[in-house]
Amino acid sequence: MTNCTDEDLDNYLLNQVDLRHRQVSKCVEDVQKIIKDLTTEVSSKDARFQSIANAGVHNASLKDQPALMSKWSALLRGRCAYNPAIQVLSPTLYLISVPLQGLMGYKERRTRQWRYYTLTGSRLLSPVREPEKLHQWLELESFVNPSQEWHDARMTIEGDIVPAKVVNVFKDLLETSIKTRGLTNKVSVLESVGTAVRVAVETSEAQIEVKLVPTVELMNYWPKRARWPRLFRRWPSTERARCIKSFGFNLMASSNYHWLLSFSRAEQVLLSNIDEDGGCRRKCYRVVRQLKEDGWCPGSKPVITAFHLQTLLFWTCEKYPCTRDWKDFRGCVLRLVQKLHKCVSQHYLRHYFIRSHNLLKYSNTNELDEVAKKINHFLENPGTYIH
């Protein structure tokens, strides 16, 4: 067995991980500028879609909540250079949420049980399938004060705000905006399966595939199905958990009928001060992410993404909450890799906030098995990878 030392890991961080971070940061900067221009143009044509500059606590609906905005700024000051709407899933694959406007005062309510409509509005003999654990219906009546513009047959059917219809309107506006802004040489719309809007963005470093998803941002509200924090858990602290829940969650238009629950703001806050006790959690995450991208799971559409690794880190932090558990850099990296190997081998990784949902449920099992073999080889010979 070829072993590795803390010094080897520190050199790996300096020579490989930091280089990757600089390259990705440059690409994010380029993509952010282009998508901001495009979504600003889209918003000028239809105010229901906002610029990504208004994502998160910059959302226009939060102007009357300065305390929440101040809290967010204080938490992420100096720690988060990226726009909160942008999630880097791999060096060449980004997910960007496009905030929606005009849906105010959300409250969870019991929705009617069955839907019998198609996306074109015609009737079905049997009902549309029910949403899975990480999805839900979204009705106009869930909002105290939806703007009149949302009472629009192009986006709703029988009182439901239908993701596929919202995406279709957005896609038409986006294609027009690419031409209006003269960005046809930098942005091209890709063929998509389902409701996704996928574009290829040319940057100074690489071509980036971007998935654009219209998103309802729900601040100061935590969904009942996300039973978190769990009883008798010591990480994060009660105060931090209360703060995180105040930032709410998102509903993303990522399927035909149902809206996907997303906790991206909560995840950003969890990461922002994850090592305030002087631990090495974030360093471990960065090393494992680099190993994944270099050898275990490379490519533009990896079966394991940065989101999976982030989720794994949160579960590991919860299981090992003490400062002393995160002092041995080498040991902590190997522990995280071992946990990743177990999840990939079993094809099972629980969502951190809705733990009944398996994030690997629909992943390609052959690809997962191949990744598991590579991770196992690393665990047998870590020194051959860390140099």
Swiss-Prot record:
Database matches in InterPro entries: Mab-21-like_nuc_Trfase (IPR046903), Mab-21_HhH/H2TH-like (IPR046906), MAB21L/cGLR (IPR024810)
Pfam families for the chain: Mab-21, Mab-21_C
SMART domains named in the record: Mab-21 (SM01265)
Family according to the record: Belongs to the mab-21 family.
Protein name as it appears in the record: Protein mab-21-like 3
Source organism of this protein record: Danio rerio
Gene designation: mab21L3
